[in-house]
C-alpha cells in the first residue's frame, strides 16, 4: 500500500469534501429545473398532420418559471436549514440521553481531553457521557459554545488510557476540522429532500385511495385529475433521484471525514497503534443501545451496521457512512 502522510491525507480530504458539499444545492436546484422541464414537456406541444399530439419542450418558458420559483424555494430551504442547524445540539443530547461529565466525577477522562486540547492548541469542548455498555464516541456541535465530545460508559470501562486518548483525539479532530458542522449541514440537506420525497409519495397514495383514479370521463369533467397525478408522479421521481444523490454525497462526505479524523487523532495522541487497537475493541460492540437513528449513528467513531461481502460489500460501501474498520486499521498501522 502506498504511504500517505497525515498532512497530505488531511489536505486531500478537505479538498474533496469541499467539492462534495457544493453538490448539495446544485442537486436541489438541478432537480427542481428537471421537474419544471418535465411538467412543461408533457403539457406543451402540437398536433401533427396525422392528428397525434407531439410533446415539445419550451426551454425559455422553463427558465423563466425557474427564475421566478427558485428564490422562493431557496428562501424556504434557508429558513428550514437555519432552524434545524441551531437546534441540532439539543436534539442530539435528547436522543442519546447524554449527560455532562465533570472533572470531579471522572478526572481520568477530563484530564485526557484537557491534555489533548493543550497539545492541539484548541479550546476545551464540553464532555458528555452516555450510560451504555456498548463502546462508542462521537463529536457534535456547530461552534465553540456547543462543541461536545460524548463517550459511553462501556468505552471508558474497556479502553486503557492510550486507547482512550486515541479515540478522544479522533473526536477532537472532527471538532478542530469543523467536521461536525459539515456533517450536520449534509444531514439537514438530506432531511429536507427526504421530507419532500415522503410528502409527495404520501400525496400520491392519498390520491390513489381517496379519489384520484376515477373514470376517464370523470377526470375530464373534474378538470385534470390525471394531470395532477402526473405532476405528483414526476415530482416523486425527481425528489427520489435528488434524495439518492444527496444520500450518496452525504455518505461520501462522512467516509472521507472519518479517514481524516483517524489521521488527525493519531497525530494528536502520538500513538496510531493505540487508536488502531481501540478501533478493534470498539468494532466488537459498537453503537448505542437506545438510539436507532441513522443520522446520529453516522457521527459515531464506528457505525454499528456491518458492511456486506463481495458485490454486496461494494454496494453497501456506497451507502455506508463509515469506511470499513479493517481499512482504517490498516492505514493507521502504516504510519
Model regions: which residues?
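Hydrophobic or amphipathic, alpha-helical segments that drive membrane association/targeting
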Residues: 1-134, 186-259, 269, 283-286, ...
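Catalytic Zn2+-binding segment of zinc metalloproteases
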Residues: 172-188, 273
